[in-house]
């Protein structure tokens, strides 16, 4: 998923990411606001070693929602 695709699907994505990964707060999601680089940073901050699993989930979500 590229940055433009991420931004375009942000409103759909943020609700599902919040359900799947509850460590990402509403404030985190407001800060990210469709920016894939910021999303990756927040995932790293909140999930550390699980970063790749979260990114894989995001990629799979995108494939299933395009």
Predicted regions and their residues:
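Intrinsically disordered, low-complexity, hydrophilic segments
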Residues: 1-66
